[in-house]
Swiss-Prot record:
It catalyses: O-phospho-L-seryl-[protein] + H2O = L-seryl-[protein] + phosphate; O-phospho-L-threonyl-[protein] + H2O = L-threonyl-[protein] + phosphate. This is Probable protein phosphatase 2C 58. It comes from Arabidopsis thaliana (Mouse-ear cress). Keywords: Hydrolase, Magnesium, Manganese, Metal-binding, Protein phosphatase. It holds the Pfam family PP2C. One of its GO terms (molecular function) is metal ion binding.
Length: 283
């Protein structure tokens, strides 16, 4: 196999979003009705693309797992890249993954962040948001997140947010209790210590005393009313509501085409950020 073809397959599996538009699609081997696709586009900023994506199915101990994630880096891409490579592996290595999935996710988020902080000389001073989804045997979905990348489910055409936006204004008391402050400058969004626009993130060693990496976690059962789930970085959510996003893609059957269309819609609404989107279809 030619080197370029090998690289292409690696990129489709891992979901690296480079400076040019990147894309991928796939489907469950156990559940033929479940398909997934992703699309990524670099924003208007001068720095390199800082989004990394995971979108794949894998078999483990007789089960099939759908692994989906958006990692939206800031002040560099190294932390987001590290998460793409390591976070799911760390979750799946937890001894209680099958018996207490939520606890396994919390432990892995915590331990992964600890390693990132220990390796700050290598990984840099930046950080990353994360939204992760683990689909177990096509029936059970566990979503975890830190930051403002978001997961949204469409059921009977109605949008249901599965993640929590960790905004500094909402967590002001917690930030202040740790010795930090939330700036509120006219014309700007609230920021932790006047710097970061999210209250929870991986990395960010210089702010870590005032930041949390504790995820919010939700559990969902996939049923006949579940149409699709979308995971996306905040470049979507700055310009589209949850319901607008669902309405924009509900009639598009191919998940990659749906992800691409949603990003194009966000760009048409003047979104300037890096944008990554995963769509998982159940029909």
């Amino acid at each position: 196999m030619a080197g370029s073809n090998i690289l292409h397959k690696i990129k489709l599996k891992a979901g690296f979003c480079g400076s040019a538009p990147d894309m991928g699609r796939g489907k469950s081997k156990m559940w033929k009705n479940i398909t997934h696709g992703f699309h990524c586009v670099k924003g208007k900023s001068s720095h390199p693309m800082e989004d990394y994506v995971v979108s794949e199915f894998k078999k483990l101990e007789g089960h099939e797992l759908g692994l989906f994630a958006i990692f939206d880096g800031h002040l560099g891409h190294d932390v987001a890249k590290y998460l793409q490579t390591n976070l799911f592996d760390n979750i799946l290595k937890e001894k209680d993954f099958w018996t207490d999935t939520e606890n396994a996710i919390r432990n892995a988020y915590r331990s992964t962040d600890a390693v990132i902080l220990q390796q700050s000389l290598k990984l840099g001073k930046g950080g990353s948001t994360a939204v992760t989804g683990i689909l177990i045997d096509g029936k059970k979905l566990v979503v975890a997140n830190v930051g403002d990348s978001r997961a949204v489910m469409s059921k009977n055409g109605v949008a249901h947010q599965l993640s929590v936006d960790h905004e500094p204004s909402k967590e002001k008391k917690e930030i202040e209790s740790r010795g930090g402050f939330v700036s509120n400058i006219p014309g700007d969004v609230p920021r932790v210590d006047g710097q970061l626009a999210v209250a929870r993130a991986f990395g960010d060693k210089s702010l870590k005393l005032h930041l949390s990496s504790e995820p919010d976690i939700t559990h969902q059962t996939i049923d006949d009313h579940t149409e699709f789930i979308l995971f996306a970085s905040d470049g979507i959510w700055k310009v589209l509501s949850n319901q607008e996003a669902v309405d924009a893609i509900k009639s598009i059957k191919d998940p990659h085409a749906a992800a691409k269309h949603l990003i194009e819609e966000a760009i048409s609404r003047k979104s300037k950020d890096d944008i990554s989107c995963i769509v998982v279809k159940f029909h």
